[in-house]
Amino acid sequence: TPLKRSLRRALRRQKMSALLLIAPLLIFILITFIAPIADMLFRSVENEIVQDTLPRTTAILETWDSESGNVPDTPVFKALYQDIFIAQERKLHTRLGSRLNYELTGASSLFRKSGRGVGDIGEVYQDQFEDMNAFWKKGENWNDILGSDAWLAEIKSWKKASGQAQPPFEIRAQIAEILPQTAAFYQIFADFTQNEKNSNLYKKDPWELIYSAFYDDLTGANAARIDTYTGPGAAELSEAKAAAANFETVDYKAAFGDIDKDWLKMPIWDTIRAYSPRFTNGYFLNAVDMQKSENGPELRPENQRIYATLFLRTLFMSTVITLSCILLGYPVGWILANLPARTANLLMILVLLPFW
């Protein structure tokens, strides 16, 4: 009936008015209370740093049989070299080391030391290419080969003083096909140089990592396709391909062993493998003196169990303080309730005085 419809509309308006009145308070509570708690709870299980910093290493580690008792093979160490090299350029390897140090004592110093040592690994190939032909020393020559014609035209006319953004690097299509690893890592190098360092890519000499990838392409499955390339630097590419067959190679596993013997031991690899997923219960396990392992959660060694002891001590002191307050508070409260008002007020002042 019209009366009922009118009543429903009136009630609806009344509810909306009440909701609007409390809306600012609800929003305030959501922003200042609920959201921080939700963020804290998310951070307690979030663990993206391992996979984001070591993407190639963690991908290959998925197929590693940790129960064999042997550290991973050379392909994993090669991926580790590539990941740590990029991470140390971006100053991320120390953050990862600090994160893993919560789980394995010594991981922080291990990653710092490795960040300083990976440059020497790539220099093995860099020195050989540059000794063979000085052409490979200059960043301009690398860009002439790897960059597209359109990008080269733009970057050569670009001036930093112009205030305009640097034209983003574009790989030459044919090079991406015949030198896939070099192209992939050079793209990372280009993004870092242009966006994070804000430097002129055309004049920047490549990372040592680029030379390692370049060697892999020259001696890999696509090596025969290099002879079909006719663009800039074709003669130098053919020369490099012929020379690379006789280059000194890098044993990545031995190289990391030279940096630190801990890379040839199981604990660091078990830790990386256990904490490679993007979400983890590791923080909660640590809080109760447990740790992740290949066999699931397990107690930490006895000399590392500190949180349970701290919790029991805290619980004991809380109980003692609570009982003391009850034993002191109830008699004082009873006395104050039964004394004359003047005397009770004086005693109340004496009770409150220590708090002031």
Locations of regions flagged by a protein language model:
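Loop-to-transmembrane-helix entry motif
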Residues: 14, 314-318, 322, 356
